């Protein structure tokens, strides 16, 4: 499973060269880090109304779309995409410290994954968190 949030969506403005290997979390995380660090977002809004577990791309991998949908009914927003993605990961019961692009961006000063330094307004993570299932259970052990 991939944690696909505000940082990675900001990086998908163009097609990546086919010769770049993004088949595992580490190389994909490095690509997302490099792309995002060129021009970080000023503000990010994440549509979390309908989530999809068993990713990435569960629909194209032949799994059951109907059973993989996660009706979250959330909108996440903030001035720092790393913080927004950290909250997204926690909502999915994933450890943001194990998401490669988040740890790389945090190390380079683009944001924090330390939840004690992130202000959440509205519903709290504990009120809305649901375990997402997927292949990378080390990142999302709640699955």
Predicted regions: what they are:
Residues 1-143:
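Extended, low-polarity segments enriched in aliphatic/aromatic residues
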């Amino acid at each position: 499973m991939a944690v696909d949030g505000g940082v990675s969506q900001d990086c998908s403005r163009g097609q990546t060269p086919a010769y770049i290997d993004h088949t595992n979390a580490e190389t994909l995380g490095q690509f997302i880090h490099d792309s995002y660090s060129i021009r970080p977002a000023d503000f990010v809004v994440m549509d979390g109304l309908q989530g999809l577990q068993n990713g990435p791309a569960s629909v194209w991998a032949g799994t059951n779309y109907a059973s993989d949908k996660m009706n979250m009914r959330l909108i996440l927003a903030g001035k720092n995409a790393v913080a927004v993605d950290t909250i997204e990961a926690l909502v999915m019961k994933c450890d943001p410290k194990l998401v490669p692009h988040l740890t790389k961006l945090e190390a380079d000063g683009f944001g924090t994954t330390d939840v004690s330094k992130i202000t959440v307004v509205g519903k709290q993570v504990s009120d809305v968190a649901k375990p997402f299932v997927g292949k990378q259970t080390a990142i999302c052990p709640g699955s």
